[in-house]
């Protein structure tokens, strides 16, 4: 079903520290031209096509970095207690660090923007790219723990961009989340993955320049409450699975799937974004943190302390997002603590045991006496709108499996009967081709939407009027 991403042996941990120093120091040596190959040497350059277990991937090392250069990268020890109540209740908030505009603040009291004809984002080619003065900041979109995102404009070609400005601290070096995101995205070219245009490094900041994307799925669902048009759900889900299949085939996990990390362009394209927590097997790590996915979209195996991650980790999030798009509410909106989150899952899927989930008793935080014993129920009993859409309940049930080994992979999900009424050409597209280049593939107006919001010049007919956990 899904590919296992195994933790690395303990003796390789030293390599991780060396890699962090190498990558962090390397940012100060990046030439200011986008086409410079120095940064490529930092990235994963070859991924084996063999089964993920036992895969040896190749990283090019930078022999030019002096060994006496000590670049400290902050490491924090996790104090995660899965049953400790958080200081505040979990609440739905919009993303502050993805490459999109805050829809509510920009569109209140206005008509939904008209859609534009689809066009693939163009990569900068001018030698002026890579320079800090090549971009103009237009407005602040959000701020996270280590980065601030601005809407910007290229002074070279006038295109809108999203500027993710990462603050550097001399004593700590470059944040490793930034290194991960930049190094992974540099090698990912797909219509359903946000495009990294440029990298700008100064003494104080590291700026990642992304294509500008109009909104995100969270804001889109907030704009259209009560569940999305079934046809639109299908197209969004298809694009999500396309993007995931692409990265999973390269043994990369996203690890932070949630609606606010799924960007929606004004042509209807869905793009995976925010790869700060993404992990490639080629980056050595003794264990993976279990504090990686927002609570509502975190799979039960991770909640129970498993660190043996596979691509199935992402597939649980897909199932949660699928249900949320159809039903109009989060699938498992835990409000108290980890225990409450697990109870909400078990209430629908049944409390696991060794018969239904072999190995569950060996998970660090599984204590049978802590949980009420529930029997599983059909998903339509929990989310009635699944019954209105052909094959939706069956697909959701194959994604929302407590045992990770039983979850459908992204590639297998794309072949599910739920998608059988889509044009066959969608499965023949090249990686960088949008699904909206296929005739008659278009988003439908959401309930209550004014037809004036749909561009008359849209070559695909009716299309998108745009609008968390």
Curated annotation (Swiss-Prot):
Carrying Phosphoserine, the residues are: 24, 78, 95, 134
Could you tell me where this protein is found in the cell?
Cell membrane; Cytoplasm; Nucleus
Q: Which domain of life is it from?
A: Eukaryota
- Quaternary state and interactors: Found in a complex with LRP6, CCNY and CAPRIN2 during G2/M stage; CAPRIN2 functions as a scaffold for the complex by binding to CCNY via its N terminus and to CDK14 via its C terminus. Interacts with CCNY; CCNY mediates its recruitment to the plasma membrane and promotes phosphorylation of LRP6. Interacts with CCDN3 and CDKN1A. Interacts with SEPT8. Interacts with 14-3-3 proteina YWHAB, YWHAE, YWHAH and YWHAQ.
Keyword Transferase, does the record have it? Answer: yes
Species source reads Mus musculus (Mouse)
Which PANTHER family has this protein been placed in?
CELL DIVISION PROTEIN KINASE, CYCLIN-DEPENDENT KINASE 14
Q: EC top class, in one word?
A: transferase
A single GO molecular function term of this UniProt record: protein serine/threonine kinase activity
| Means of activity regulation | Serine/threonine-protein kinase activity is promoted by associated cyclins CCDN3 and CCNY and repressed by CDKN1A.
Reactions this protein catalyses: L-seryl-[protein] + ATP = O-phospho-L-seryl-[protein] + ADP + H(+); L-threonyl-[protein] + ATP = O-phospho-L-threonyl-[protein] + ADP + H(+)
What's the protein here called? Cyclin-dependent kinase 14
Q: List residues of the Protein kinase domain.
A: 135-419
Q: Which Pfam families match?
A: Pkinase (PF00069)
Q: Which GO terms describe its biological process?
A: cell division; G2/M transition of mitotic cell cycle; regulation of canonical Wnt signaling pathway; Wnt signaling pathway
Tell me the function of this protein.
Serine/threonine-protein kinase involved in the control of the eukaryotic cell cycle, whose activity is controlled by an associated cyclin. Acts as a cell-cycle regulator of Wnt signaling pathway during G2/M phase by mediating the phosphorylation of LRP6 at 'Ser-1490', leading to the activation of the Wnt signaling pathway. Acts as a regulator of cell cycle progression and cell proliferation via its interaction with CCDN3. Phosphorylates RB1 in vitro, however the relevance of such result remains to be confirmed in vivo.
Q: Which InterPro entries match?
A: CDK (IPR050108), Kinase-like_dom_sf (IPR011009), Prot_kinase_dom (IPR000719), Protein_kinase_ATP_BS (IPR017441), Ser/Thr_kinase_AS (IPR008271)
